[in-house]
Each structure stands twice: as structure tokens, then as C-alpha cells.
Regions:
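Conserved small/polar residues in nucleotide/adenosyl-binding loops
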Residues: 172-173
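Soluble extramembrane regions of membrane proteins in the secretory/endomembrane system
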Residues: 1-162
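Individual transmembrane alpha-helix segments
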Residues: 163-167
Length: 173
């Protein structure tokens, strides 16, 4: 279904996901198309390119996951991994809000902002772990699954927390 394409990536892959959303959003606006080819993106472990110059072109729902104890957080504006007040997270959430609304000054973690159908949905997660463990953490993975199930209106018979992939990694590596 070409109307429901999603992209995700961790770390540099997260950068690629948001850059892809900006690219296809800009392409859609230049072609006078209301919709980007990328319906939704989920960025894990990378917030450095969550700048207005990138976000202004995005016409996709955005999910963000950033490790609270990320060892690279010293590069963030506030020099820490707390996304509640991080300018990077605030820019993401505010980029999906109507211009007539006041800008938020604090992100409520785990709250879905915006409208999925307008592709202005935004959510930020801040799991209490280190950057390299995000792709292997059950909570971080469940948050990502929940995001895509929500934006694509997909109801799985399995709970996002019902994961067995860790056993596969452990037993077959």
C-alpha cells in the first residue's frame, strides 16, 4: 500500500529517516501534492538534525525515541538526554502544531500530539537506557511498534510487548 509507507532508523539511520521525510515533504510541496510519499517516520537515538531547517519540510507523522542516558547527549543543546525540555524535542512537537497555537515549553513524554490524518502527529519517548541498547530494548521496541500501529491504524493480535526476537538473537548468534 503506497499510501502507508513508513521509515525508521537508529542513530545515523534515524538521521536518514528524518532527512527522507524532509526530502519527500519538500518534493510533495514542489509538485503541489498534499501528501509526502513517507506517511510516517520514527527516529531512534538521533536528535541533532531535528532543526527547523529540516522539520519545516516534513509532511509526515514523526515519532522520536531518545535514550535518557545517551552517551552522546553532550552534543545536544542542553547537554543532556532529558527530552521534556530539549529544544530538539520541542521543535518536533511544535512543528506539528497549528501556527496560531502557542509553542509548547515542555513535552509530555509518550503523548501523541497532532493529527494522524493531517500527518502532523508527533510523539517523543525518552526511555531510561543507553544509546546502544535502544534497538535491543523491549520498551523502546514496543514504543516503536505502538507508533506504527497507531499511525497506520493497524490492530495486531499481538501486544507490542509480546516480543520473542531477543531469544532469537541470544540463541542463534
Amino acid at each position: 500500500d503506497k499510501s502507508r509507507i513508513g521509515a525508521t532508523g537508529h542513530s545515523a539511520g534515524g538521521n536518514a529517516a528524518i532527512r527522507g521525510a524532509a526530502y519527500f515533504g519538500k518534493e510533495a510541496s514542489e509538485m503541489d501534492s498534499a501528501l509526502s510519499k513517507l506517511h510516517s517516520v520514527y527516529i531512534s537515538g538521533y536528535v541533532l538534525t531535528l532543526r527547523n531547517s529540516v522539520l519545516r519540510h516534513v509532511n509526515s507523522n514523526i515519532g522520536v525515541s531518545y535514550a535518557l542516558y545517551d552517551e552522546g547527549a553532550f552534543r545536544n543543546k542542553l547537554k543532556n538526554g532529558d527530552m521534556r525540555f530539549a529544544p530538539e524535542a520541542l521543535r518536533v512537537v511544535n512543528s506539528g502544531r497549528l501556527k496560531t497555537l502557542p509553542k509548547l515549553k515542555e513535552v509530555e513524554l509518550g503523548k501523541l500530539y497532532g493529527n494522524i490524518n493531517d500527518r502532523t502527529a508527533r510523539i517523543v519517548h525518552n526511555e531510561p537506557l543507553l544509546h546502544p541498547f535502544q534497538p535491543y530494548n523491549g520498551l523502546a521496541t514496543a514504543n516503536q511498534i505502538k507508533f506504527f500501529e497507531t499511525v497506520f491504524s493497524h490492530k495486531s493480535e499481538l501486544s507490542p510487548e509480546d516480543q520473542i526476537w531477543q531469544w532469537n538473537c541470544l540463541l542463534y548468534t
